[in-house]
């Protein structure tokens, strides 16, 4: 029997401990070899730049930072060390750069002469081998490219025929249509000669078909070019954008010697400071200003002006890149203030702008709105006094005033709007104190703006080209009175009365926009929505679809007052005020979306009985000066401010079934969407709380708590629940009935069997002329 071998556990334990110590020492040595340990003074610390909007840092100045190191804290205290890898240590040490700013050479320990011989020209054998291999690779690439070209040439069709040799200096394929366009674009711009504009701008104006300046342009452009601060007031659609856009571009052309764009060396030498800042109250107006100025610049030869638009709803990082080298900045106040706060050093550049333009100033400077405007104005007007300036002065010299220490930049302030008086911003509803004074008083408007803005001149030039009326001359204003529940019916009737007319419908709430858009779409009308709760891309998409030349000429845009200012869309013939505007200036800007320039347009108010007080105050504020004007304006006195629009009651009665069905369908769809969103919110809240949620049980308890529709909002909730209770089959039946009604023409008392017996023009029907919505003769609106 063999003897059993005994194991010594103590020896194995000792060997394992020794092995772990050896491995730890090896790892430590390898870690120390791969990293360098340095002290605090050896690192090249970088100064932390503080944000521009940080006024009071509470002592946190002179902060420095370093990246790419680890902190080593001694166990027994002592100096803190920093560890970094050898690949990164070269870039963070103080001596890693020489005096010239170039990286220092990598000094290595001398290890003697190598085995490789060196030629007389200092090229090693290893370098020669690398060059030889590189040449072989290039030869292979050349052969590959040649073979690919041969293959592509072989793939060409054989019946192409022999190639025609052409001169490299002559471009082929240019059609004569381009020459024809050049001839057609020639417009007589001799009317602009009195403004002394450059040849580049006159060429651009000719290509844009602007043959003569408008009154506001003729009055403002010379004053701005002379360096004056200007306050311009003109009716909507009078060309106020070019009144300040042309002088800004003219200044740019004069700065670069007649339109020459800055060279690359000039761009490197310059700090890329913006030249002009244009503030806009809405995103749509900002993008429209960008479009107009871009068209002006693109049609001017040899002119390269960089324009950046900063609005909400778009990428803030992209806007930061655009601001870095922008010449003209067009922005809404909120997003601009946000971007300025996230950038370093940009506020100091913004203080050096040459032009500050405030478009729609009455809205931007109104009390309680756009707080960021005041912050932006205070920031660019703030004067900083550096410590170096005080250090250079002797102690005997008195402290200088801020104006003496750093003189303000020669910035021009340009203010434009169609309404300036604060009385127009008072609410039309409710109890207000009515003052029977001149609502367009020049003195009050000047004092109001002088308190808000820091003009360079003591008294800026106030230019008012239409002191009597703020409305466009070719605008017709009408009024439709209706019952409280018939607004939808009269709106639909007005739209049918104006076929092939682009119509803009204004409401006072977002919920009304959503409901009317759904209602008109159910009535088979091309309708788009626009309100502030929409995403920015959706807003731009709605405006693009509504204003596109390829879209339906009967397109309808239902919008809140976000579209009331500055929106310049060609072809808008009708403005319908579904709700009476809250203020008189809003009515002016709403109606200004039509009858722009020399075109004509209509503006119609739909007035319910409870809105008559607001309409009376509106007429008193807007049209009061017409009665008090001089005898030379006798023609305007004969014109009734708001003409009554008489609609045919037969047509209204025949359209009522359509609108009733459309309202039922719309209310059902919106109620289902609302209940679904509320149910989703309650379900997610129940999951967060960890409780069970039953929608039917919750609805039953809620109805019991409300007391069967009693209390505030109880009746509305009961109607919504009833509308949402419609099944899919019932909803589909209502839609089928509505489609059948909409597919037919509205008969106004004509026999469909004997068309020739009445007043129907059969030839016009066959040609598609007249109003396709009606069957029979319909009188046009009298106003």
Curated annotation (Swiss-Prot):
Residue sites binding ATP per the record: 234-241
Bias-annotated ranges (Acidic residues): 105-121
InterPro entries: DEAD/DEAH_box_helicase_dom, DEAD_box_RNA_helicase, Helicase_ATP-bd, Helicase_C-like, P-loop_NTPase, RNA-helicase_DEAD-box_CS, RNA_helicase_DEAD_Q_motif
Pfam families assigned: DEAD, Helicase_C
Locations listed in the record: Nucleus, Nucleolus
Motif DEAD box per UniProt: ranges: 359-362
Superkingdom assignment: Eukaryota
Disulphide-bonded residues: none
GO molecular function, one term: RNA helicase activity
Region (Disordered) residue spans: 1-32, 94-168, 388-410, 696-719
Its EC number(s): 3.6.4.13
Key word Nucleus present: yes
This protein's UniProt keywords: ATP-binding, Helicase, Hydrolase, Nucleotide-binding, Nucleus, Ribosome biogenesis, RNA-binding, rRNA processing
Alphabetical GO biological process terms: rRNA processing
Segments forming domain Helicase C-terminal: 490-648
Reactions catalysed according to its record: ATP + H2O = ADP + phosphate + H(+)
Top EC class for this record: hydrolase
Motif mapping: Q motif: 190-218
Family the entry assigns: Belongs to the DEAD box helicase family. DDX24/MAK5 subfamily.
Name of the protein: ATP-dependent RNA helicase MAK5
Organism: Coccidioides immitis (strain RS)
Gene name for this UniProt entry: MAK5
């Amino acid at each position: 029997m063999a003897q059993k071998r005994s194991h010594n556990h103590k020896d194995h334990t000792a060997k394992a401990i020794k092995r772990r110590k050896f491995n730890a020492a090896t790892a430590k040595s390898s870690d120390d070899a791969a990293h360098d340990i340095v002290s605090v003074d050896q690192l090249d610390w970088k100064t932390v730049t503080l944000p521009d909007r940080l006024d009071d840092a509470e002592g946190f100045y002179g902060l420095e930072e370093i990246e790419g190191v680890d902190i080593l804290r001694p166990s027994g205290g002592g100096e803190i060390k920093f560890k970094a890898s050898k690949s990164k240590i070269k870039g963070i040490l103080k001596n890693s750069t020489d005096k010239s700013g170039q990286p220092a050479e990598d000094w290595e320990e001398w290890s003697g002469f190598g085995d490789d011989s060196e030629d007389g020209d200092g090229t090693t054998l290893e370098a020669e081998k690398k060059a030889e291999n590189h040449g072989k690779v290039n030869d292979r690439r050349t052969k590959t490219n040649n073979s690919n070209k041969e293959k592509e040439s072989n793939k060409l069709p054989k019946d192409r025929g022999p190639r025609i040799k052409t001169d490299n200096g002559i471009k082929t394929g240019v059609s004569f249509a381009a020459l024809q366009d050049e001839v057609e674009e020639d417009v007589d711009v001799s009317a602009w000669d009195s403004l002394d504009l450059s040849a580049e701008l006159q060429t651009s104006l000719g290509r844009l078909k602007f043959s003569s300046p408008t009154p506001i342009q003729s009055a403002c452009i010379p004053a701005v070019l002379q360096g004056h601060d200007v306050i311009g007031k003109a009716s909507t659609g009078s060309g106020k954008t070019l009144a300040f856009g042309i002088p800004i571009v003219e200044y740019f052309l004069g700065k670069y010697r007649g339109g020459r764009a800055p060279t690359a060396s000039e761009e490197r030498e310059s700090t890329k400071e913006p030249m002009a800042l244009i503030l806009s109250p809405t995103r749509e107006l900002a993008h429209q200003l960008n479009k107009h100025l871009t068209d002006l610049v693109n049609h001017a030869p040899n002119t390269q002006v960089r324009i950046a638009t900063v609005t909400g709803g778009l990428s803030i990082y992209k806007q930061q890149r655009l601001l870095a080298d922008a010449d003209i900045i067009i922005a809404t106040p909120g997003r601009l203030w946000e971007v300025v706060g996230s950038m370093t050093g940009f506020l100091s550049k913004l203080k050096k702008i040459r032009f500050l333009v405030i478009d729609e100033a009455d809205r931007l400077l109104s009390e309680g709105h756009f707080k960021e405007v005041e912050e932006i104005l205070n920031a660019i007007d703030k004067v900083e006094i550096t410590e170096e300036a005080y250090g250079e002065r002797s102690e005997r010299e008195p402290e200088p005033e801020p104006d003496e220490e750093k003189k303000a930049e020669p910035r021009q302030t340009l203010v434009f709007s169609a309404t300036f008086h604060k009385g127009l911003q008072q609410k039309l509803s409710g109890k207000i104190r009515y003052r029977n004074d001149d609502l367009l008083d020049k003195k009050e408007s000047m004092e109001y703006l002088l308190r808000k803005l820091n003009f360079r001149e003591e008294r800026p030039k106030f230019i008012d080209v239409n002191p009597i009326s703020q409305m466009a001359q070719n605008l017709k204003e009408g009024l439709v009175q209706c019952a409280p529940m018939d607004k939808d019916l009269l709106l639909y009737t007005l739209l049918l009365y104006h076929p092939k007319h682009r119509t803009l419908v204004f409401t006072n709430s977002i919920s009304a926009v959503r409901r009317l858009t759904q209602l008109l779409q159910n009535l088979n009308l091309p309708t788009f929505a626009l309100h502030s709760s929409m995403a920015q891309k959706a807003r731009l998409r709605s405006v693009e679809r509504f204003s596109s030349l390829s879209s339906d000429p009967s397109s309808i845009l239902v919008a809140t007052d976000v579209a009331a200012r500055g929106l310049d869309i060609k072809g808008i013939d009708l403005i319908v005020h579904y709700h009476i505007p809250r203020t008189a200036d809003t009515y002016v800007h709403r109606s200004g979306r039509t009858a722009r320039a020399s075109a004509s347009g209509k503006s119609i108010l739909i007035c319910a009985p409870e809105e008559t007080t607001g309409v009376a105050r509106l007429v008193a504020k807007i049209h009061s000066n017409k009665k008090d004007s001089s005898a030379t304006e006798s023609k305007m006195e004969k014109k009734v401010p708001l003409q009554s629009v008489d609609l045919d009651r037969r047509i209204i009665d025949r359209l009522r079934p359509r609108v009733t069905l459309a309202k039922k369908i719309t209310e059902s769809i919106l109620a289902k969407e609302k209940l679904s969103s509320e149910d989703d919110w309650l379900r997610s809240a129940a999951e967060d709380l960890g409780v069970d949620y039953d929608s039917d049980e919750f609805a039953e308890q809620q109805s019991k708590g409300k007391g069967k529709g009693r209390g505030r909002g109880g009746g509305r909730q009961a109607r919504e629940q009833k509308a949402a209770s419609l099944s899919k089959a019932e909803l589909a039946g209502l839609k089928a009935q509505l489609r059948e009604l909409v597919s037919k023409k509205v008969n106004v008392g004509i026999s469909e069997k004997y068309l020739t017996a009445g007043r129907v023009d059969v030839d016009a029907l066959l040609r598609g002329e007249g109003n396709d919505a009606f069957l029979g003769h319909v009188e046009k609106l009298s106003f």
